[in-house]
């Protein structure tokens, strides 16, 4: 039986790692699933853990008021040392481009434990945009043995960097699995459905979306906080406008 340790610390990571945790837990005869959270985001992380009923085996709880990247990196690195020595996993899975991911991958490397990188291969090829995420994911990619790329483009990025094709797997993005789970939860829970419809109305959306049997399709769009202003935001708005004009039967909600 293989020991699989999944390490994450922020809300986005938790959202995308939750389906993997559930999948591994359903194969208890093949895998021992170990969940380690760093608490890089504390309250926002805990929201997702409650949603998926995930109870971490280890919690580094590194969050401190006024912490910076130096603090996060150092606390994750030293915290993971003790966790890895105790748990002795066969593989460490990290996600994306956070400081938690990079520091955890580095800690696993120091312990000579192979790393799998979920959502691998995203690149802008500018280490300062986004910062520090672009460098984080490049470093993590250099450490990782297995690369789980969401798209063919991500795979090509890794191939261009010299990663062995046999170690790259196009998996899609696990956020879609999370989306299906949440939609199913909302449909089965009248209280949650009512709360969502209230929030939609308060945001100016006129339709009680989940209450309608016959309804228009809706596309919900979110953006990284750094793209919510300046040129990035303008480009997002232009793209939404193009899509809205092309697909008039769909409502695009940003």
Spell out what each predicted region is.
Residues 1-39:
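N-terminal subdomain of nucleotide-sugar transferases
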Residues 29-75, 79:
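Conserved nucleotide-sugar phosphate-binding/catalytic loop shared by glycosyltransferases and other
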Residues 30-32, 237, 241-254:
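A conserved nucleotide-sugar
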Residues 36-38, 42-43, 143-235:
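A nucleotide-sugar donor-handling region in carbohydrate enzymes
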Residues 88-90:
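Proline-aspartate-enriched helix->loop->beta-strand connector
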Residues 93-111:
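An aromatic- and histidine-rich active-site surface loop
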Residues 117-131, 143-145:
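A short, histidine- and acid-enriched strand-loop-helix "catalytic/donor-clamping" loop
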């Amino acid at each position: 039986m293989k020991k699989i340790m999944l390490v994450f610390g922020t809300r986005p990571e938790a959202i995308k790692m939750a389906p993997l945790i559930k999948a591994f837990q359903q194969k208890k005869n093949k895998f021992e699933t170990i969940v380690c959270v760093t608490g890089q985001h504390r309250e926002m992380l805990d929201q997702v853990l409650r949603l998926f009923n995930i109870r971490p085996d280890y919690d580094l709880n590194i969050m401190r008021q006024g912490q910076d990247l130096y603090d996060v990196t150092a606390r994750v690195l030293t915290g993971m040392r003790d966790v890895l020595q105790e748990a002795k996993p066969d593989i460490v899975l990290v996600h994306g481009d956070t400081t938690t991911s990079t520091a955890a991958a580095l800690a696993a490397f120091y312990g000579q434990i192979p790393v799998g990188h979920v959502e691998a291969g995203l690149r802008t090829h500018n280490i300062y945009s986004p910062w520090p995420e672009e460098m984080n994911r490049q470093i993590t990619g250099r450490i990782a043995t297995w690369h789980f790329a969401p798209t063919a483009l991500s795979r090509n990025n890794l191939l261009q960097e010299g990663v062995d094709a046999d170690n790259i797997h196009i998996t899609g993005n696990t956020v879609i699995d999370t989306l299906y789970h949440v939609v199913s939860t909302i449909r089965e829970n009248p209280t949650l459905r009512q709360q969502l419809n209230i929030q939609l109305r308060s945001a100016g959306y006129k339709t009680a979306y989940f209450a309608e049997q016959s309804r228009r399709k809706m596309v919900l769009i979110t953006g990284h906080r750094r793209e919510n202003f300046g040129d990035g935001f303008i480009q997002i708005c232009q793209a939404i406008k193009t899509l809205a004009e092309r697909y008039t039967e769909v409502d695009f909600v940003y």
